[in-house]
Amino acid sequence: VIDQETKHYYQAGFLFIPFGIYTAKKVTKKISSYLPKGVEHLNIRVDLIKPEENKVIISDDRELAYDILIVASGCRIVPAEIEGMDGEGWRKDIFDFYTVEGSTALAEKLEGWKGGNLVVHVAEMPVKCPVAPLEFAFLADWYLAKKGKRAGTKLTYVTPLAEVFTKKRTSEILGPLMAQKNIEVVTDFAIEAVDSGNKVIKAYDGKEVPYDLLVTIPTNMGDEVFERSGMGDELNFIPTEKHTLKAKNHDNVFVIGDASDLPSSKAGSVAHAQAEVLTENILRHIEGKELLPDFDGHSNCFIESGYGKGFLIDFNYDVEPVEGTFPIPGIGPLKLLKESRINHLGKLAMNWLYWNLIIKGIKIPFMTSKMNLKGKKL
C-alpha cells in the first residue's frame, strides 16, 4: 500500500465537527492500525504512473513494478479552480468542511457567529457525498436555533443543479423541507468567481449571492498524478468500466471509490459495495477468467435533517430512491425516504461500524453489495 498519509479519516464525520458533535480525534486513526499483517505500507508520494510499463514512480525516484494496480486515491477539494475562492477570505469567512482542517476551523468560526448571511454553496458536480451540503444546511439551521442565533441569520443554499439534489424523488421531499426551515434555495448557479472583498459569489449568467460566511464545497478532483500520467479525464478521474471496476484503458488497473469517473455517488457506502465486486474480479483476473459485471452502482446515504432526525435513501444506477424498509426487507428497522429519529441514530452508529467492522472487511448482516429490491415500493 502506497500512501503519503499516516492518518486515516472517517470522512463522513467531518460534517459533525463544525457543530461540536464530533471532534477531529473521533474521526482520525493511524493507517498502520488497520493494515493486515504482511501488508507493507510505503509512506511516500506517488509522482508518476507508467501504465504501459506497469511501473509506479515514487517521490524518492524509485520505480516499483506491478502486475495489478488498484487505485484508491479518492478525490480532493480544489478551491483554486474557482477565481478568488482561495484568496484573502479563505478560512476567514470562506470555509470548507470536506477536510479535517476546514471543519475544525469552521467550528471555531460558528462558535463566534453573530448573525448575517450564511451561504452553503456547491461549486460543481460531482462532489464527494452529494447529500453532505444539504445536511450541513439542515444542521446549521438546528445549531443556530439552539444558540439563539437563527433569527439573525439568513440561510441560503446555492447549487449548480436544477433541484436541491441529484435524485428527483429525494428533491421532492428535501426541497419543501428547505422551505419549511426557511432556507432559501438558489438553483442553476454556475459559479464564475468569488469576490471576497465585497463578499459576493458571482455566476456566469450575472446572478450574485451575498455572504457574510460562505461554506463552500469547491470543485472536486482526482489526484494530480493521473494528469501527469495521462490516465485521468478533465477532472483527473480515471475512466472506469461501471460494472467491473476495471480501468477502461488499462487491463490490469482497477479503480475503487472516489477516484473513478463512475456515475455513482462518491460515497463510503459505494466504495464498500464496490469492494466485494472488486475482490472477486481481481481474483478472476489472476485466474484469467472473464470479469463479472456485478457492480450496480448501489449507494445508501443517511441524510441528517437536524433536531435529532434524519432520512435514509437507497438507490443504484437504474433505481431511484424509493420508500421502503432497510436493511431487512419488510422489517427495517430503518425507513427509506422517511424522516425519523432512528435514521439519525443510524447515522451516528456508522462511526463505530466503520472503525470496528467496515474498514476491517468484516461483513455486516443484511448489507449487500447489490441493491436489494425487496421491501421497497417500486
Where are these regions (language model features)?
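Beta1-alpha1 glycine-rich phosphate/pyrophosphate-binding loop at the start
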Residues: 1-40, 124-168
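FAD-binding beta-loop-beta segment adjacent to the flavin cofactor pocket
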Residues: 236-254, 305-325
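C-terminal auxiliary extensions adjacent to catalytic cores
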Residues: 312-378
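Internal hydrophobic alpha-helix adjacent to the cofactor/substrate pocket in enzyme cavities
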Residues: 142, 271-297, 303
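FAD-binding core/adjacent interface of flavoenzyme oxidoreductases
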Residues: 39-135, 139-148, 215
